[in-house]
Amino acid sequence: MEAERQNQLVARLEDYAEREQALRRYLDYDAKSERLQVVNAELEDPAIWNDPKHAQDLGREKKSLEDVVETLTELGSGLADSCELVELALADSDDATLEAIEHDADRFQEKLETLEFRRMFANPADPLNCFVDIQAGAGGTEAQDWASMLLRQYLKYAERKGFKAEILEESEGDVAGLKSATIKIEGEYAFGYLRTETGVHRLVRKSPFDSSGGRHTSFASVFVYPEVDESFEVEVNPADLRIDTYRASGAGGQHINKTDSAVRITHAPSGIVVQCQNDRSQHRNRAEAMQMLKSKLYELEMRNRMTEQQKLEDSKTDVGWGHQIRSYVLDQSRIKDLRTNVEISNTQKVLDGDLDPFIQASLKQGV
């Protein structure tokens, strides 16, 4: 191995070791390690299952802690071994070992970047699960088809990230596609990853619904909000609620449309409307809809608190809640984020859920 490459390898390992130590401090490795021991001890107690919800909460906490503690432990150990081994390999001019260490360094870099990316999640709600509302804009069948394409895109994104996705509500379009849909996405930092997707998404293409092959522009809005838990206090006055039941619509099996199991809740003071139809049980649909309502009310409160700050920010930039954020020009093979200027030419890959380039750029720029 040439001398320059050797020097680069040594410099990389030294840099990675410094970054690993910085991450230990920033992510509070010692405290998380101690907490993990406590959580493991609690989960080993058979009595924990007398309270299934508490046990599930501890299980989720354990996974979150392990993701940090085990990754940093393995990273620190691997870097220490490689730093020691590289000195021996250099002394013996052992090129095979040096190349193996280079390969390990690539893995170290990937793990470091994953952990460093977590520093982008400053919102207290970032670690939570989330709901994604998709609403077709003006444009009839073309816009409704676009809404269904976005639904598929986010389901594919969740699959890529290892998140669990569930369609809670979908209202079919008049001819094709969807008028609206709501999906729940469960996974670590689901809201943190997806929150920058909120906004208006614009599609430009030759419409399959136009026999002349004309070029059409259509819009759909996306709204992402966190699923709040008991640690977030949200008060709902039952007197402010109007609860309606109706028969579920959309794709379904033999039980679909047999009973009024779907639930719609309207919160009079805010005008917020939520609906859920994914379960055959009206009781479970009602509970899920209430959770959605509380989550939307929490997000509304957070946005109200930030109104003045947003006014200042909006005076500096053209990025706001209701502004267009991304343009999908399919016949020119171009998808561009209008906030970060990230542009992708492989449109099908994006529509198949590869949103990471857009999301990472948005988080890094603090969108």
Swiss-Prot record:
The entry's keywords: Cytoplasm, Methylation, Protein biosynthesis
Localization per record: Cytoplasm
One GO CC annotation: cytoplasm
Post-translational modifications: Methylated by PrmC. Methylation increases the termination efficiency of RF2.
UniProt keyword annotation of Cytoplasm present: yes
Coarse class of the protein's main subcellular location: cytoplasm
Gene3D superfamilies, per the entry: 3.30.160.20, 3.30.70.1660, Release factor
GO MF annotations in UniProt: translation release factor activity, codon specific
TM regions (residue ranges): none
InterPro entries given in the database record: PCRF, Pep_chain_release_fac_I, Pep_chain_release_fac_I_sf, PrfB
In-chain residues carrying the UniProt-annotated modification N5-methylglutamine: 254
Gene Ontology process terms (BP): viral translational frameshifting
Similarity-based family: Belongs to the prokaryotic/mitochondrial release factor family.
More info: The gene for this protein contains a UGA in-frame termination codon after Leu-27; a naturally occurring frameshift enables complete translation of RF-2. This provides a mechanism for the protein to regulate its own production.
The protein's role, per its UniProt record: Peptide chain release factor 2 directs the termination of translation in response to the peptide chain termination codons UGA and UAA.
Protein name: Peptide chain release factor 2
Species of the source: Bordetella pertussis (strain Tohama I / ATCC BAA-589 / NCTC 13251)
